[in-house]
């Protein structure tokens, strides 16, 4: 389990994250919602160690990790799919997937499961990442994050700019991974219907703080749609 307690983060004189607390449980999808600019991506970057926190704690499996480097956090089992995918355009699909195995012993094979989850990657194994469509690149980015077998998978707006058929495939994979029961999933998402379909529980952020939280099945009753409407 990933546990965040009362973290604060500043950028210059701006207070970006304000006493944010949350838990991401194994076997569950925790969805983070909120309008643009409320601190969602900064929160994820803080969890990965890409930006420092001023106060509070981040723990994984009971061990505090907020002083660890991004590399050390990845080795502990945090997989991150950033907004914009950030695949290596000049590398082949196979080479991109092997980048996800950088923390594993040399010669570790690419898990066959990745091609079961995303069959299109098997067909395009020797194509350059830059030649793939946006949806295919997103599938590659998720597969790369899964290659090392993370205990926590963090996704930042995986449906952004993706065609509906691939959004459906990505949702199916996320649900399957959660139901398998060996991974916690933390999902930042702007597409409300996609988030509602997947959420076991949720938080809504506003101005860097947690405005609301609850069970995914209660999102409509709790009025979450109106809280995140643009």
Model feature map: region roles:
Residues 33-35:
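The feature captures the beta-strand-to-loop junction immediately N-terminal to the Walker
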Residues 48:
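Helix-to-loop junction immediately C-terminal to a conserved catalytic motif
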Residues 56-64, 76, 109-110, 116, ...:
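Conserved ABC transporter NBD signature motif
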Residues 64-84, 111, 123-126, 219-224:
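ABC ATPase NBD coupling module
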Residues 91, 132, 145-146:
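ABC ATPase signature
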Residues 128-132, 136:
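Conserved ABC ATPase signature
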Residues 147-151:
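A short, proline-enriched helix->beta-strand linker immediately N-terminal to the Walker B motif
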């Amino acid at each position: 389990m990933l546990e965040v307690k009362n973290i604060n983060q500043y950028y210059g004189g701006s207070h970006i994250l304000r006493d944010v607390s949350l838990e991401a449980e194994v076997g569950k999808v925790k969805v983070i919602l909120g309008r643009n600019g409320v601190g969602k991506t900064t929160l994820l970057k803080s969890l990965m160690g890409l930006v420092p926190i001023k106060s509070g704690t981040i723990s994984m499996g009971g061990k505090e990790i907020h002083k660890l480097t991004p590399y050390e956090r990845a080795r502990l089992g945090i997989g991150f799919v950033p907004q914009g995918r950030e695949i290596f355009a000049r590398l082949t699909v196979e080479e991109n997937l092997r980048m996800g195995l950088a923390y594993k012993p040399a010669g570790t094979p690419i898990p066959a499961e990745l091609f079961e989850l995303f069959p299109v990657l098997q067909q395009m194994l020797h194509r350059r990442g830059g030649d793939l469509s946006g949806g295919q690149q997103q599938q590659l980015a998720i597969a790369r994050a899964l290659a090392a077998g993370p205990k926590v998978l963090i996704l930042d707006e995986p449906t952004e700019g993706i065609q509906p058929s691939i959004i459906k495939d990505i949702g199916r994979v996320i649900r399957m991974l959660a139901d398998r029961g060996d991974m916690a999933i933390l999902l930042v998402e702007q597409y409300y219907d996609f988030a509602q379909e997947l959420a076991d529980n949720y938080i809504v952020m506003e101005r860097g703080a947690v405005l609301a939280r609850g069970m995914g099945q209660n999102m409509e009753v709790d009025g979450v749609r109106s809280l995140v409407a643009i």
